[in-house]
Regions:
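Glycine/proline-rich active-site loop of Rossmann-fold NAD(P)-dependent oxidoreductases
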Residues: 162-175, 210-220
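NAD(P)H-binding glycine-rich loop region in Rossmannoid oxidoreductase-like domains
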Residues: 44-94, 120-122
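Conserved Rossmann-fold NAD(P)-dependent oxidoreductase catalytic core, especially the SDR/UDP-sugar
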Residues: 85-134, 153
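SDR active-site strand-loop-helix element
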Residues: 6, 30, 70, 111-117, ...
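Conserved beta-loop-beta element that borders a ligand/cofactor-binding pocket
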Residues: 115, 142-167
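Mid/C-terminal beta-alpha module of Rossmann-like enzyme folds, strongest
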Residues: 193-194, 200-263, 279-307
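A conserved pocket-lining segment of Rossmann-fold NAD(P)-dependent short-chain dehydrogenase/reductase
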Residues: 175-198
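N-terminal Rossmann NAD(P)H-binding glycine-rich loop of SDR-like oxidoreductase domains
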Residues: 3-23
């Protein structure tokens, strides 16, 4: 299958592109800028473009059998001093369905959107969060295009565990250093609450399953392990060799401020994915502990001082 992975230089997109390539698909990554030399997808073909500015053309997409959309922006990507309503419109609520419509008009037959779980699990969160509402609109807007000629579906995953060299490794560098016990000025607690977590490898497997067997118009709530934030922090500490216990406090934390907890500090978003959907998509469960250990290894390797 000839597949275009939009957002293919990001953490989720890069893992997905490599997974699809390794299983035999002909993969191209779409990116706004140049691909770094140390990127996991540096050896893959690149299509330059920006879906938020509608720079892709029908001719760009015509060669592809399928598109994986893994470029969705979240609260970490919201720039300062921007019109938030306009940002989410371009990045999510209008931008994603418009890109899906372009893919459909180009003759692409399969489209898998990597979305987010908030609106799927707790629809009422869209009433209080512009981000969640935008994710919902992007999900529903793209799936509304489904018909006999265009199999479009959405995967709605939880918090994803993974890293690649570059921005994501740098984002986790200080957190891994703290987990190892090297940042005494950062408190050893986690905020109250928790959520579901999933490895990026499991998500990539689910994308592959959705490309092969996803139902037109379907939205799949995917996930793996329900963890408190303290349990997730503890996995990081254990993987980094920090040799201490992380307590739960009803206080914000530098690595998980209240702005990052969409459901609100102290609340838990826990669920079990539907077993039939898990089997259909064919992704691995029980992979979070391994993924945290891998994250620590990747971050350390990518951020180590040059010899």
């Amino acid at each position: 299958m000839k597949v275009l992975v939009v957002g293919g230089t990001g953490m989720i997109g890069a893992h997905t592109a490599r997974y699809l390539r390794d299983r035999g698909d002909d993969v191209t990554v779409a990116a706004r800028g140049a691909v770094d030399a140390d990127s996991p997808v540096a050896d893959l073909p690149v299509l330059r473009g920006d879906y938020t500015r509608q720079t892709f053309t029908r001719e760009d997409l015509t060669p592809f059998d399928a598109v994986v959309f893994a470029a969705g922006q979240d609260v970490r990507h919201l720039p300062r001093d921007v019109n938030e309503t306009q940002f989410w419109k371009e990045a999510q609520s209008a931008g994603v369905p418009a890109f899906a419509a372009l893919a459909k008009s180009a003759g692409v037959s399969r489209f898998v959107q990597v979305g987010s779980y908030y609106h799927h699990l707790r629809p009422a969160l869209a009433d209080s969060s512009a981000y969640v509402a935008a994710r919902r609109d992007a999900d529903e807007g793209a799936r509304a295009l489904a018909d006999a000629s265009f199999t479009v579906c959405t995967l709605n995953p939880p918090s994803i565990i993974g890293a690649i060299p570059g921005i994501t490794a740098k984002r986790y560098r200080r957190m891994v250093s703290w987990a190892a016990g090297n940042e005494p000025q950062i408190p050893d607690h986690a905020p109250a609450g928790g959520t579901n977590y999933m490895s990026v490898r499991s998500l990539a497997e689910a994308v592959g399953g959705a490309l092969d067997r996803g139902t037109a118009g379907a939205a799949y709530l995917v996930g793996d392990a329900n963890l408190t934030f303290a349990q997730f922090f503890q996995l990081l500490v254990d993987a980094a060799g920090g040799n201490r216990t992380i307590a739960e406090l009803d206080e914000p934390h530098p690595f998980m401020p209240d702005s990052m907890i969409v459901q609100g500090r102290g609340n838990v978003l826990a669920y079990e994915p539907d077993p039939a959907e898990t089997a259909l998509l064919g992704y691995t469960r029980g992979d979070c502990e391994r993924a945290v250990a891998e994250l620590v290894e990747v971050v350390r390797a990518a951020t180590a001082p040059a010899a």
